[in-house]
Amino acid sequence: MLNNCVVLIRKSVLLSPNLKYIRNMSIDIGGMRIKYKEKDETFLEKHLVSKEPFGQFKSWFEEACARKEILEPNAMCLATVSQEGFPSARFVLCKGYGKEGFKFYTNYGSKKAKDIEGNPNVAATFYWEILNRSVRIEGRVEKLSEDDSTKYFHTRPVVSQIAACASYQSTPIESRDVLCEREKLLEQQYMIPGKEVPKPSYWGGYLLIPRSVEFWQGQRDRLHDRIKFRRPNKGEVSDERLLHEGEDGWVFERLSP
């Protein structure tokens, strides 16, 4: 019966007068837009709470955390590039930040980790829609110490620790049942009070060390505000007109939207 239904569906599609449209379908969504902030809600240099990017990030991040509509304010889209020059992006969770950089954890056998091994230059973006704000980070990544990775691993829920052991991230798998069977076996082994799940050697953390951090705030008239912190080029001097002296070796500038 199922095969007959599939045949009928295929025939109906093939005989459809709209088949040409279906094959060449192009949807125009150019008119989709939302209103951002009002003209009196601009993000100016005088509004910076810090003259270095980490203090400014802390301020914006805490505002995002305070908004219950933002379920995962620490989610960031991480972009990597393979040795062949092909980019890819995915969301990861930032698990710590400070003047040294931004921390995230993953499987060292994953696509992102293989990209990083061949090319440690990455970009990451936080986007908080309800605030009409984003933060763009460009820099390089380094592996965190094994001790750091192990300490964080054991702060995770046990089910998450087991999932990390059960999944060989980014490798093809026959079915979800295979994963579930691995998980079941690991649960039988480790879901025992007082028994610790060992961190897999292929799992750990990275530190994203920024070269630049850009703060973007959307404006209703599309003249968006962009203030970028970056490390100065060799011999570059701040003129306090276009380029401003920051703190801790940073400079900042306003960019056209």
From Swiss-Prot:
GO terms for molecular function: FMN binding; protein homodimerization activity; pyridoxal phosphate binding; pyridoxamine phosphate oxidase activity. Induction: Expression is up-regulated by exogenous molting hormone (beta-ecdysterone) and down-regulated by exogenous juvenile hormone (JH) III in the silk gland and fat body of the fifth instar larva. Keywords: Flavoprotein, FMN, Oxidoreductase, Pyridoxal phosphate, Pyridoxine biosynthesis. One of its GO terms (biological process) is pyridoxal phosphate biosynthetic process. InterPro entries: Pyridox_Oxase, Pyridox_Oxase_CS, Pyridox_Oxase_N, Pyridoxamine_oxidase_dimer_C, Split_barrel_FMN-bd. Disruption phenotype: RNAi-mediated knockdown of this protein causes significant decrease in transcription levels of pyridoxal 5'-phosphate (PLP)-dependent enzymes phosphoserine aminotransferase (PSAT) and aspartate aminotransferase (glutamic-oxaloacetic transaminase) in silk gland, fat body and midgut of the fifth instar larva. It catalyses: pyridoxamine 5'-phosphate + O2 + H2O = pyridoxal 5'-phosphate + H2O2 + NH4(+); pyridoxine 5'-phosphate + O2 = pyridoxal 5'-phosphate + H2O2. Pathway: Cofactor metabolism; pyridoxal 5'-phosphate salvage; pyridoxal 5'-phosphate from pyridoxamine 5'-phosphate: step 1/1; Cofactor metabolism; pyridoxal 5'-phosphate salvage; pyridoxal 5'-phosphate from pyridoxine 5'-phosphate: step 1/1. Expressed in silk gland and fat body of the larva. Pyridoxal 5'-phosphate binds at residues 95, 152, 156, 160. Binds 1 FMN per subunit. It is an enzyme of class 1 (oxidoreductase). Optimum pH is 9.0. Active between pH 7.0 and 10.5. Substrate binds at residues 33-36, 222-224. Its EC number is 1.4.3.5. FMN binds at residues 90-93, 105-106, 112, 169-170, 216, 226. Transmembrane segments: none annotated. The keyword Nucleus does not apply. PANTHER family: PYRIDOXINE-5'-PHOSPHATE OXIDASE (PTHR10851:SF0), PYRIDOXINE-5-PHOSPHATE OXIDASE (PTHR10851). Homodimer. Belongs to the pyridoxamine 5'-phosphate oxidase family. Catalyzes the oxidation of either pyridoxine 5'-phosphate (PNP) or pyridoxamine 5'-phosphate (PMP) into pyridoxal 5'-phosphate (PLP). This is Pyridoxine/pyridoxamine 5'-phosphate oxidase. It comes from Bombyx mori (Silk moth). The gene is PNPO.
